[in-house]
């Protein structure tokens, strides 16, 4: 199965520019990434099997800034990959979707009330505005080999109604594909949170990690 996956990735990378296929509903959330599951979804084309959404996730690291940042908190935010699709005609393409409302702070050092407050603010109009932008989407445009079980996955990431081109290095271990990239909130029309006159704030740059699992038997 893994040989077939690698062969599929390699052959597509050598000769096919993958085009985004259908207009997807725009989403707003820290990323993404999901963005990044391009390699995993493309891999499943070898057997036309789905990704394992139960074991596929997006994780975002949000960092504090400002004069009094020592009194603030960094945050780890996570959401499952909601769905993915492979289109074989008229041209090969892949898509990923994350439901923005599924994002939750994992911060173990925060009490439950504080985590709930962080999540409410994150999903609200001030940041993600999930009522208006319920999903994050990614559609691949090209995949280039970068070594053994490694690829550079390029695609279009849509957050908060803004689409940006991104390229993410992806590594495979067994059936799991992992990638990491950094994005800026302002690139997607999101103003980083600032409180107390900016003495405590969130950095514009976010680190985004993903883990995509191919379904058993595919």
Where are these regions (language model features)?
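N-terminal hydrophobic alpha-helix used for membrane targeting or insertion
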Residues: 6, 12, 33-34, 115, ...
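Generic detector of low-complexity/intrinsically disordered segments
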Residues: 11-14, 38, 43-44
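Compositionally biased, low-structure terminal segments
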Residues: 10-13, 31, 69, 139
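N-terminal secretory signal peptides that target proteins for export/translocation
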Residues: 1-27
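Low-complexity, acidic/polar, glycine-enriched regions of mature
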Residues: 46-218
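Bacterial N-terminal signal peptides
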Residues: 29-41
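Hydrophobic alpha-helical context, especially transmembrane and signal-peptide helices
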Residues: 28-29, 75
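N-terminal processing/targeting junctions
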Residues: 15-19, 36, 144
